[in-house]
Amino acid sequence: MSAKEEKVIRPIVHFPPSVWADQFLIFDDEQAEQANVEQVVNELREDVRKDIVSSLDVQAEHTNLLKLIDAIQRLGIAYYFEGEIEQALQHIYDTYGDDWKGRSPSLWFRIFRQQGFYVSCDIFKNYKEEDGSFKESLTNDVEGLLELYEATYLGVQGEGILDDALVFTRTCLDKLAKDLVHSNPTLSTHIQEALQQPLHKRLTRLEALRYIPTYEQLSSHNESLLKLAKLGFNLLQSLHRKELSEVSRWWKGLDIPNNLPYARDRMVECYFWALGVYFEPKYSRARIFLAKVISLATVLDDTYDAYGIYEELKIFTEAIQRWSITCIDTLPEYMKLLYKGVLNIYKEMEEIMGKEGKAHHLSYAKESMKEFIRSYMMEAKWANEGYVPTAEEHMSVAFVSSGYSMLATTCFVGMGDIVTDEAFEWALTKPPIVKASCAIARLMDDIHSQKEEKERIHVASSVESYMKQYDVTEEHVHKVFHKKIEDAWKDITRESPVCKDIPMPLMTRVINLARVMDVLYKHKDGFTNVGQELKDHIKSLLVHPIPI
């Protein structure tokens, strides 16, 4: 480093080191054993498939069929039965439309809404008395209360009956959880977990871990389904560990902790992030690419926020816009590794996709990365000038700098034939569902990261912008933002059935991005300061298999 560089005052911050070291670098392949397990899995899949198909034409079995589908989804094995589930739900929808005749209307409503069917909430009018209050009989049905509570999170703007039902069920369930602490601690815990995080916001693999032991305790459980859930979980965990080993070797080659020590070393957490977006085996290459992009996006974030000086950032931004290795000589020494790392992962994926005639898909991902970097540069400009943007100015840029519009486009790369050029173009236009996911990411991040970022030269957060513009307290802003976050979730539900030209598996990736935020940033910035909860999640998903 030159004497000139040494005099530069950098907005440096010391982030906690990685808690994982090289734990995931080595992967022990057990192919022979896995082949035997896969044979058993295929037999179990056929058993469950028959259960689904046999119930289709028997209307009296349709409620039980919905309960079976719900169990399959919560056990994390719906990817084994995508076609069968789609066929079953379409058949039931064609049979009843909005006029559901079976039991468990709350379950019917939730499953169809989360699958992208727009069914009416008028079915819940039967739950109310003439004076508008909810029927007293509902308070005695714990399972029914839980089902109704979970259904309310699939509401959209203007559905007042669901807003009322949420208040009603939360009040009842909160009381029940306290009353049952001693008499039925298992049920009390189950209720508390639901109140803490509704099903609609949970990550599938984490819900599978939580639900498998619960399902096993049900006297009515399907033995084939239970065994399939356990074996399937462990099989998939083995694939995920193999992928993480590959990403770990790539990260080790960059040696970020030594070469760029100012940046967060969160590669394992970034893989967890990508795993939250898609865990299914067929998305393996997409998941590996996304994990690498998120890992480097974290370093880019820290370069702009916590280390780079304004003139350096201008040069780096221009280099990313040009996207050419010939730009590398214009960069400061420490930025060269980062720039080369970014270009290399896109080039590598371009070569992989080129074998299928889809190399051009990377051009969409590059465009979203360029826009992402431009948003960082705008925030760096504001920070350099000491400018506090209005809340509206801030959000127009912060939606992009959250990284979620970039990730919403990038996560489609490598997903297979389901992704078309039109799907990428749709994502790049930032449709309402992408904007909603971005809003959730930005607002949750700002609520919990603001205090740490104030301690260094950093653009005013959306919290500070709102406080200054409207002359209100931080506590008031947090309430406003939490309401905006809930509204964004409603926008996601509203948009799922609207985007008919975009396949549901692609929409699900955008929704899953929002779900990851609800895990990582619900109570604090659990990504920067990795706590015990996230460590436990990662260990349970990537270290410890489920006992069979």
UniProtKB/Swiss-Prot annotation:
It comes from the Eukaryota. Higher levels in leaves than in flowers and stems. Mg(2+) 1 binds at D301, D305. InterPro entries: Isoprenoid_synthase_dom_sf, Terpene_cyclase-like_1_C, Terpene_cyclase_plant_C1, Terpene_synth_N, Terpene_synth_N_sf, Terpene_synthase-like, Terpene_synthase_metal-bd, Terpenoid_cyclase/PrenylTrfase. Binds 3 Mg(2+) ions per subunit. One of its GO terms (molecular function) is magnesium ion binding. Mg(2+) 3 binds at D445, S449, E453. A motif (DDXXD motif) lies at residues 301-305. Monomer. PANTHER family: OS04G0344100 PROTEIN-RELATED, TERPENOID CYCLASES_PROTEIN PRENYLTRANSFERASE ALPHA-ALPHA TOROID-RELATED. The Asp-Asp-Xaa-Xaa-Asp/Glu (DDXXD/E) motif is important for the catalytic activity, presumably through binding to Mg(2+). This is E-beta-caryophyllene synthase. It comes from Tanacetum parthenium (Feverfew). The gene is CarS.
